[in-house]
Amino acid sequence: MIRFGVDFGGTKIEAAALDAEGRFQARVRGPSPPDYDAGLEAVRELIAEAERQAGAKAARVGIGGPGSPSPASGLMRNANSTQLNARPFPADLERVLGRPVRYANDANCLALSEATDGAGAGFGVVFAVILGTGVGGGIAVNGRPLLGRNAVAGEWGHTPLPWPAAEEWPGPACWCGRRGCLEQWVSGPAFARDAGKAAEAAAAEDGPALARYVDRLGRGLAVIVDILDPDVIVLGGGMSNVDALYDRLPAGIAPHVFSEAFDTPVLKARHGDSSGVRGAAWLWPPEPPP
């Protein structure tokens, strides 16, 4: 029983085939072309190579990537890979691949992967966070992604930093056209900008920049707890590798939660940067063996 998935990222595209136990039967990567049509062709070539490695044909493909298609028009919106916006990306992928495609936001793929057999396995409601070049959130409920009526559930990175201090208002300009989005405060580049040095070096120093980061991330996640109250929060993306977050974030979240108690686990994604392609593969039921 084989599933095929693609993680369409800003710098790389990865295609993979997984067996029923979630083990890789094929895995291949290539750079992300900046051109729309070249991106479609890159996905076609990577799926063909994954099929060759797995010795199986993909009857359908799950795709995870930035943004999401509008339920009203089918056109992409909210993608930081801006060449996708206002284009019928899922439909064009179906045309190029010649088979059905399911597309989901990459944060929803993270949530699905981790809820299935990762750090969120066994929890009913999983809120998964990407803290990388960009910032996003995804929700899985009872092992299935929650998209919402407008297919924007979990778009946490483009909500404002809660309870901003005077020096944080109105906040840095965001590519989406607003100011003060959480992405501009808790992404990897935002942390590096605030620290005045590379994110890894600043995290290793464990100084004021990291304290500010934990405070801002805690405020942002407290709003999620008040609205969704997930059973677990799973962190992915480059900043999830900062080990100090897991000791400090609960204390950064708790004062802002509208409750006298807060005990939600904050865990690191088990599958790391494989979660995107794994979650994309899990978007479809398994395919029978050839």
How should each PLM-predicted stretch be described?
Residues 74-86:
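A charged helix-plus-loop insertion that forms the helical arch/lid used to bind
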Residues 123-182:
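Glycine-rich phosphate-binding loop of actin/hexokinase-like ATP-binding domains
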Residues 7, 62-66, 104, 128-134, ...:
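Short beta-strand segments
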Residues 1-61, 70-73, 90-101, 114-123, ...:
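ATP-binding/phosphotransfer module of carbohydrate and carboxylate kinases, centering on a glycine-rich
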Residues 103-107, 111:
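Short loop/edge segments at beta-strand edges and connector loops
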Residues 27-29, 79, 148:
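Residue-level detector of high-confidence beta-strand sites
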Residues 24, 76, 145-146:
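Hydrophobic "anchor" residues
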Residues 31-34, 60, 84, 148, ...:
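A short acidic/small-residue loop/turn micro-motif
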